[in-house]
């Protein structure tokens, strides 16, 4: 059964997170990302939530890698009170906030991500500094802060929607990853040389209508098929 956290546990976790943020800022004097998940209800971590968190890390790290941004420091914790990751970066805060906001707004799963960006002085970078609208509610799409403040939606509604978003994103990602591996296996196989009678890097073997290039084209075209098979 999933652990249900108490108010005291959550307050302690929040205090420890704030303390850790302060220590990192004092040590590095750099832009810092604090990544957590927006999870309603008393269950803040389980295998499904952890997978969603890992997908968020993957998206963030892929985006930073594409921009050749390498963290000065990284740490992660996975407790019953939730998952946390800290990235210390020698980059301009607004640039980093643009990256994290794009991830938060770029998919349904991103609505569960809370990627705070802190300046070297500890001040949080606000979305409005980039001209972005406030984050929207998981249920109705209106302002998340307004819905939270007025408690329009029940915890059960939010939990159901959260679980739905996590499952959909994980299934989609797993299907795509499996399809990529299947395509890679086909390409590795055709590149294995020599293979008497079969298509390889130097000849077409007994095949009159295929060479390595047509094989690669055919393999690439199979991605949607493999993806559908996994689903």
Language-model segments: which ranges?
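Long, contiguous binding/interaction regions
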Residues: 1-59, 104-110, 117-121, 127-130, ...
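A glycine-rich, hydrophobic loop/mini-helix early in the fold
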Residues: 56-76
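A broadly conserved sequence feature marking short terminus-proximal activation segments
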Residues: 75-126
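Charged phosphate-binding loop/patch that engages nucleotide di/tri-phosphates or the phosphate backbone
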Residues: 168-179
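Intrinsically disordered, low-complexity segments enriched in serine/proline and basic residues
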Residues: 185, 198-199, 219-223
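Aromatic (phenylalanine/tyrosine) cluster motif
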Residues: 188, 213-215, 223-226
């Amino acid at each position: 059964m999933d652990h249900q956290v108490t108010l005291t546990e959550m307050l302690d976790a929040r205090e420890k997170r704030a303390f850790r943020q302060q220590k990192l800022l004092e040590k590095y004097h750099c832009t810092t990302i604090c990544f957590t998940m927006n999870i309603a209800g008393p269950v803040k971590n389980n295998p499904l939530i952890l997978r969603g968190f890992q997908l968020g890390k993957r998206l963030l790290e892929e985006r930073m890698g594409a921009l050749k941004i390498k963290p000065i420091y990284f740490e992660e914790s996975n407790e019953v009170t939730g998952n946390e990751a800290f990235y210390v970066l020698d980059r301009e805060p607004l640039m980093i906030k643009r990256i994290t906001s794009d991830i938060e707004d770029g998919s349904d799963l991103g609505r569960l991500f809370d990627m705070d960006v802190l300046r070297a002085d500890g001040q949080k970078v606000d979305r409005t500094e980039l001209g972005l609208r406030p984050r929207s509610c998981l249920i109705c799409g209106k302002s998340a802060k307004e819905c939270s403040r007025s408690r329009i939606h029940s915890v059960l509604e939010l939990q159901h929607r959260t679980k739905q978003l996590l499952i959909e994103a994980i299934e989609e990602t797993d299907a795509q990853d499996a399809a990529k591996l299947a395509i890679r296996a086909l390409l590795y196989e055709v590149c294995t040389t020599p293979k008497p009678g079969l298509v390889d890097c130097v000849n077409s073997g007994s095949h009159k209508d295929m060479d390595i290039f047509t094989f690669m084209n055919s393999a690439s075209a199979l991605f949607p098929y493999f993806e559908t098979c996994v689903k």
